[in-house]
Amino acid sequence: MAKIVLYYKSKCGATKKYAEYISSKLNCEMKDAISATDEEIDEYDTIIYGGGVYASAIIGSNFLNNHQHVLKNKKVIVFAVGITEYDEFTSSESLFRKNIPQSLFNEIYTFNFLGSIDCKKLKFMEKFLFKSMLNNIKNKASYLKTPTDNIIIKHWKKGIDLVDFESCDELLDCAKISKQIINED
């Protein structure tokens, strides 16, 4: 039977929410990426990694660098959770190219999910980065603003929660397919 494990690194909690949801749907173990060892990873057929996006970096993506020699022989699924959405104007490929080792890039399945943010809980530098992003959104031409951009502009002071578990369906299907293929052998 295919063994699946989900590693994650969460800062504001949205990535952990997705990790809990995905692991419950796949009936797989969920672990903090910090505790991962090569020996442990080698016990699984499919590795899912999730991390929050901050300043174009997927937190904990060093997990992929540190374990790439073991991950090369596995099915690897990576999901990134951030407050902005990717569309035809902003490609998520550049985010993943910056954060996934070149040796793994073409073999990994990648997904983006919308997260949450509570500005009251941000540290000084995080607030600075968020306000910079907010200014960029506000300065976009109106026809380029996405519905998410408008939500961020309107509600950023109160906190924003855009977590949407239905957006996980494609990732779940991807992981289930590998489980079925291995079970058929």
Predicted regions and their residues:
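N-terminal beta1-alpha1-beta2 submodule of the flavodoxin-like/Rossmannoid cofactor-binding fold
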Residues: M1-K72, D173-D185
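FMN-binding flavodoxin-like domain, especially the glycine-rich phosphate-binding loop
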Residues: T46, S56-D185
